[in-house]
Every structure is written in C-alpha cells, then in structure tokens.
C-alpha cells in the first residue's frame, strides 16, 4: 500500500463524516472540511496517534472569486494550511472555506498550533478573513490606517491612497491616488528567421 493511500485511509477512519472532500494531486493530499468542523478536525489531526500532525508549517488566505478559466461558483474565501507529521513523515494540506463571502469568519487554530499566530494575522490583513478566538488579530504588514485588504481580487492594483513625506509639514501624509489608469496593448513584431526558426 502506498504512503498516500495509508494516510488517506487513516484520515477517513479518524475523521469520518467530517471529511467534505479528499483530493489527491501531484503526490499530495488536500483535505477539505467545513468551517463548523475545522477546529475539531485540527485537534484530531494533531492528537490522533494514526495521524500525529505535530506542526503547522503555513497558513494562507485565498480569494477564489476568479479562479481557473472562468468565474468561481463556490464560496469565495478560504484558509489553506500545510501540516507536517514528523512521527509518520507525511504532509497534508487542509482547506476550509469561510461560509460568508461578505464577512469571512473562521475559527482560529491558535489553541491547536500556537505557531499559526502571525499566519492568521497575515490572512486577516491581506484578505480580511477574521479568525474567531485569535488573541491579537490586527494588521501585521500593512499600515494601521490602511483601507481594505490588498490581496483580494477586487482590490485596485494602484490602491486607494498613497503616502509621501511632506517637507513643509515635516511628516508623512496620505492623499488620494494620483495614478490615472491606462490600457497598455502589447504589440507583437514578427521578423523573418527570428531566433533562427523557419
């Protein structure tokens, strides 16, 4: 039995109906769970002797509003965690979708893996995903006065405001963005024998 098959069987046995979907692609397993089961599943993944995912390596937010070749018809925001079992030497990706696209809220994993602290803060800062139960959920990389969440696909590339140092006021000031959007149309120039190809 292959290593992924052993992990898949252990996940199905330990989690039962909590497994919403289990996807195998490129030699990795992705476990999809519902937000209501997320915290309980995380504890089982850590504590069950047949699984023993001792480490959370990473957690990131994802905006699926424009995913793949067309419009995404599922829930918009997800948190994706990368887990590692040192005991069994295997990895697992866990994906959970926030049930509300307008105000995405998911349970915090801080009580399961305390190393998730800054990862959840980053997902909050960039995507606006609120992690319920997080002890210090505030921006981590953008400025305190930053408006919006810059990794959302509907966030304008130029942003809303720009900041600069004003020598007259001797301080940093914020002002509306002065960049005018423009359309750039690429041109393709074809030359005979370009690159030595006929």
Swiss-Prot record:
Name recorded for this polypeptide: NADH-quinone oxidoreductase subunit C
Function: NDH-1 shuttles electrons from NADH, via FMN and iron-sulfur (Fe-S) centers, to quinones in the respiratory chain. The immediate electron acceptor for the enzyme in this species is believed to be ubiquinone. Couples the redox reaction to proton translocation (for every two electrons transferred, four hydrogen ions are translocated across the cytoplasmic membrane), and thus conserves the redox energy in a proton gradient.
Gene designation: nuoC
InterPro entries from the UniProt entry: NADH_DH_suC, NADH_quin_OxRdtase_su_C/D-like, NADH_UbQ_OxRdtase_30kDa_su, NADH_UbQ_OxRdtase_CS
Similarity section: Belongs to the complex I 30 kDa subunit family.
NCBIfam families recorded: NuoC_fam, PRK06074.1-1
UniProt-listed PANTHER family: NADH DEHYDROGENASE [UBIQUINONE] IRON-SULFUR PROTEIN 3, MITOCHONDRIAL (PTHR10884:SF14), NADH DEHYDROGENASE UBIQUINONE IRON-SULFUR PROTEIN 3 (PTHR10884)
EC number: 7.1.1.-
